[in-house]
A protein has these predicted regions:
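Juxtamembrane intracellular "pre-TM" segments in multi-pass secondary transporters
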Residues: 2-5, 185-214, 397
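Extracytoplasmic gate region of multi-pass secondary transporters
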Residues: 29-30, 210-251, 257-258
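Conserved MFS/SLC helix-loop-helix module at the cytosolic interface between two early adjacent transmembrane helices
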Residues: 60-95
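Helix-to-loop junctions at the C-terminal end of transmembrane segments
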Residues: 61-73, 260-273
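Cytoplasmic helix-loop-helix junction between adjacent transmembrane helices
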Residues: 103-141
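Helix-loop-helix hairpin linking two adjacent transmembrane segments in secondary transporters
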Residues: 137-185
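C-terminal transmembrane helical hairpin of 12-TM major facilitator-type secondary transporters
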Residues: 274-319
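A late C-terminal transmembrane helix in Major Facilitator Superfamily
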Residues: 326-360, 367
């Protein structure tokens, strides 16, 4: 095992670029759905499935992906990066919807392996006091990928130039996967340690109250963010806000979130202020959604959504850092559980808003109500200082689960 220094940052940077690539390829067609429909000769609703298959497959594949990361970490992550890049290239196979869907399916299968590894990559390649920063960088990479998709779509894919957009994104995906492959040649700090994880790890983790708290917060936070990203343009249209202006609001939210991810999570971890921050994030989400429904001026709404992005998006790396502390050798499975809960939240809250989409104020208030469900959860959020006891209990439970399985095999 090599010494714990800062030499793992190239791996973190390469991994963040692959996280960005998965999000970029996921949202390729969302900003240019009408042009994509004309390009492939299908309906706009059919184009929507090119993005909607991602959360659906994530819910199915999350736990197997997490177990794979815990037992075969580097090979699994390499395969995830390679499959992401292959999906981007596969979309260039022909000007048919089938080729587009084939590429998206490949990326959708890779996504659970890639993003579920955020905690484990930081745990394997960074010392303890740098892990919160590492998870924040990877999370910022994911949000940067979303931002890049929102920018490149209208810039390169306008006026039916879909192939040009796909070529550029395929190149970016291949470069990111190549960088990850190069940096993963060197094993991490814990590369020679076998994870004490077996089939019962999910049940063991779920038995921990803190794990259920973290999953609940992911469900709420992801749910509201995905619903906003999906329906904001439609909800603001009755107020006379154009599709382009609504797109700018989303970009502002993500930009503010990336800035928050760069600064807040490591600072909060050092000060043990995660619980206070999560309370603020939940309340910001609730009051922000209500304000978006109540305000009529575009400038006021822009200010609200920027503040929401600045506070809400950094909550993801804060949750993932707490999950990594809790899970011990089962970081992959635990991370997959968090992301699965988040994707479930995205599906559920987006469907709730879809029912209310023709009543914008009711839709925004529904998202505010969902946000308030996180208030009691945030009150139980584990800080770095308060979680030590349960981390020890969780590690012992996981080790005991693995020992029990081994005993049954003898």
């Amino acid at each position: 095992m090599r010494s714990r220094d800062s030499s793992g940052w190239p791996t973190i940077a390469a991994f963040a670029s692959v996280c960005a690539g998965t999000q970029l390829l996921w949202l390729t067609y969302a900003p240019v759905d009408t042009g994509t429909a004309h390009y492939y000769g299908v309906s706009v609703s059919a184009v929507g499935w090119l993005a909607e298959i991602f959360p659906l497959l994530y819910v199915v594949l999350a736990i197997p992906a997490g177990r794979l990361l815990d037992t075969h970490f580097r090979p699994a992550l390499l395969a995830g990066g390679a499959l992401m890049a292959a999906g981007g290239v596969l979309r260039l196979g022909g000007q048919t919807f089938a080729w587009a869907m084939a590429g998206q399916l490949a990326v959708a299968v890779a996504q659970p392996v890639v993003v579920s590894a955020m905690g484990k990559v930081s745990a394997d390649y960074l010392p303890v006091d740098r892990r919160a920063a590492g998870i924040a960088v990877a999370s910022a990479g994911s949000f940067a990928g979303m931002l890049l998709a929102l920018i490149l779509g209208p810039t390169l894919g306008a006026h039916g130039q879909i192939e040009r957009l796909l070529v550029v994104q395929a190149v970016l995906g291949v470069l990111a996967a190549g960088a990850l492959a190069l940096t993963l040649r060197r094993p991490g700090y814990e590369g020679d340690e076998s994870a004490a994880v077996e089939g019962g790890a999910v049940r063991t983790l779920w038995a921990l109250p803190t794990m259920r708290t973290l999953c609940g917060l992911a469900f709420v936070g992801f749910g509201v963010f995905v619903a906003l990203a999906t329906w904001l343009q439609t909800l603001l249209s009755p107020a006379g806000i154009s599709e382009q202006s609504a797109g700018v609001l989303l970009v502002a939210m993500v930009v503010a979130g990336i800035a928050g991810c760069a600064v807040l999570p490591p600072l909060l971890a050092r000060r043990g202020a995660e619980r206070t921050f999560m309370r603020g994030a939940v309340l910001t989400s609730a009051f922000g959604c209500a304000a978006l429904g109540a305000f009529t001026m575009l400038g006021a709404r822009a200010g609200v959504i920027a503040v929401m992005g600045l506070v809400m998006l950094p909550a993801l790396p804060v949750i993932l850092t707490a999950t990594e502390r809790l899970a011990g050798s089962a970081e992959g499975t635990a991370g997959a559980m968090i992301w699965m809960a988040g994707n479930l939240g995205g599906l559920v809250v987006a469907l709730i808003v879809q029912v209310l989409v023709h009543e914008p104020l009711a839709a925004f208030l529904a998202m505010a109500a969902v946000s308030l469900l996180g208030v009691p959860l945030a009150a139980r959020f584990p800080s770095a200082r308060s979680a030590e006891g349960e981390v020890a209990v969780g590690g012992a439970m996981l080790a005991g689960s693995a020992s029990g399985v081994a005993g049954n095999e003898d």
